[in-house]
From Swiss-Prot:
Pfam families membership: Autoind_bind, GerE
Origin superkingdom: Bacteria
Function per UniProt: Functions as a potential OhlL-responsive transcriptional regulator.
Residue stretches making up the HTH luxR-type domain: 174-239
Gene Ontology molecular functions: DNA binding; identical protein binding
Protein name (database record): Transcriptional activator protein EsaR
Length: 249
């Protein structure tokens, strides 16, 4: 769905200018407006004042799949500061993304959350840094209602620019319906999440053990994690795993 913005720099610039104008009363802080498809989190829109190099790195590594800020937002509706305990999974280590973000002075922030009508997760993150750190943090906490309405406004502007109410709506909706996993990948991951061994999964699904391992490897790559256990945990946390058709047999 969000490829439309990647392919149309004028529309992207229009949305970015709008966001920056609305945030200017706060002193034009660094920000990120991020939208992630709940059905396929590999689909992401990022409109941000962060350095271009960091955004390219973030996209290339699909960091939204393991970003603690994103993962926390999936499970809540209220705003939160980054200094809270936002790690959802004790066996997933986020040292890579944290160490990299520090190089771009992206360390402390405040995030507002919106679960929208198109089954997407929208976030507005404001970076807190510099001499005015305390003042900005206090203001963001005090004006949560105003900031939340700004996020809603930004999200509506995004859909308006994308034309979901116009002639591009069918194509956008069709793209949004695509899931992150193929049916076979989902089936294999489902049975793995139910505690089945690779041999048991192979017997249930009628494929070879090597094919089961092949699909698990694809899932691990898509989710940007290190192993099957982490893939299962992340799939469960993000509600990406659907009951397999073979479960009804």
């Amino acid at each position: 769905m969000f490829s439309f913005f990647l392919e149309n720099q004028t529309i992207t610039d229009t949305l970015q200018t709008y966001i920056q104008r609305k945030l200017s009363p706060l002193g034009s802080p660094d920000y990120a407006y991020t939208v992630v498809s709940k059905k396929n989190p590999s689909n992401v829109l990022i409109i941000s004042s962060y350095p271009d190099e960091w955004i390219r790195l973030y996209r290339a590594n699909n960091f939204q799949l393991t970003d603690p800020v994103i993962l926390t937002a999936f499970k809540r509706t209220s705003p939160f500061a980054w200094d809270e305990n936002i790690t959802l999974m004790s066996d997933l280590r986020f040292t890579k993304i944290f160490s990299l973000s520090k190089q771009y002075n992206i360390v402390n922030g405040f995030t507002y959350v919106l679960h929208d009508h198109m089954n997407n997760l929208a976030l507005l993150s404001v970076i807190i840094k510099g001499n005015d750190q305390t003042a900005l943090e206090q203001r963001l906490a005090a004006e949560q209602g105003t900031m939340q309405m700004l996020l809603i406004d930004f999200n509506e502007q995004m859909y308006r620019l994308a034309g979901t109410e116009g002639e591009r709506a069918p194509a956008l909706n069709q793209s949004a319906d695509k899931t992150i996993f193929s049916s076979r990948e989902n089936e294999v991951l489902y049975w793995a999440s139910m505690g089945k061994t690779y041999a048991e999964i192979a017997a249930i699904t009628g494929i070879s053990v090597s094919t089961v391992k092949f699909h698990i490897k694809n899932v691990v790559v898509k989710l940007g994690v290190s192993n099957a256990r982490q893939a299962i945990r992340l799939g469960v946390e993000l509600d990406l795993i659907r009951p397999a058709a073979s479960a009804a047999r």
